[in-house]
Amino acid sequence: MQKVVLLGSTGSVGKSSLEVIEQNKEKYEIACLVALSNDELIKTQAKRHKKAKIYIEKPRNKLSSKKLINKNDLLKLISSNNVDTVIAAISGSDGLELIHHSITSGKKVLIANKEPLVMAGEFLVNEAKKYGAQIIPIDSEHCSVHQSIQGKKENSISKITLTCSGG
């Protein structure tokens, strides 16, 4: 059973990821749901994932729940043996710190947006090699590139051109 931390569980990619996980309950279990501010939706999600912890960066309302954890606890959880995979479905650069922490903790990290790879791709890839982590892109464009270069030697590719982007 893969234990998953879902960064950005209340966004569109996060909600889609939850649907896939819920359809594959025998393979995956949510260890923690992470959101920026949508505390109402994350509470609903947590009811469906009874064992999941909750972390909200900027809650809109005061929440009280035994499941609620602080950022330090989130970092400890990601570092622990209780997590196998981190899905980074946070837009922009906001998830970069948690992505880096997940990589340095040796996790499998599924990245759903291009920004972290554009900003720090070489650094993150080198860190993944150093710490034995996996970076797997799940956004359409960079997932296609990832799939296209699997099994190829690094020096055999000099250029990649994307002919369209954004749908």
Question: What are the functions of these language-model segments?
Answer:
Residues 31-36, 52-58, 113:
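Short internal beta-strands
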Residues 69-102:
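Beta-loop-alpha module in the N-terminal Rossmann-like domain of NAD(P)-dependent dehydrogenases
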Residues 10, 46, 86, 106, ...:
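Residue-level signal for inorganic ion chemistry
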Residues 87-89, 111, 162:
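Redox-cofactor binding/interface segments in oxidoreductases and associated redox assembly factors
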Residues 1-49:
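N-terminal Rossmann-like dinucleotide-binding module
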Residues 142-167:
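Conserved anion/nucleotide-ligand pocket segment
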Residues 16-25, 45, 119-133, 148-151:
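Active-site-proximal loop->helix
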Residues 93-105, 114-134:
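Rossmann-fold NAD(P)-binding glycine/threonine-rich loop
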